[in-house]
Amino acid sequence: MGIADFLAQKKTAQAKANLEAGQTFLANNAQKEGVVSLPSGLQYEVIHMGDGPKPTLHHKVTCHYHGTLIDGTVFDSSVQRQQPASFPLSAVIKGWTEALQLMPIGSKWRLFIPPQLGYGDRQVGSHIGPNSTLVFEVELISFT
């Protein structure tokens, strides 16, 4: 077995382990009070509900966010950088696209994103492994 085969086997094993851990996490999380589960598999918890308008797919949104894995490992945080992020809503992972269209401006929600609405079976950076379930706290500041 060559190095490429070894790395492929390692990625497959990690993807399987991440998928199983995420499925268990989401099943348990769905039972928690205040957690809403959508047909897509997306789950969310409202930390604060804003009262402004909601963005659509064609808007550019400005948000603060803090992203972790289910074990609490932080992989990205505009909060830690002290700089909100702006991006087209159509250019982010499916879980964000779905959730943010439900959020009024001024809202802060915790999102629980299964792999099929996140990065799927791709390795992203050094922290997000294949089939990772992602957790984000997202505050919708504005949109244009």
For the regions a language model picked out, list residue spans one by one.
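Cross-family detector of peptidyl-prolyl cis-trans isomerase
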Residues: 1-144
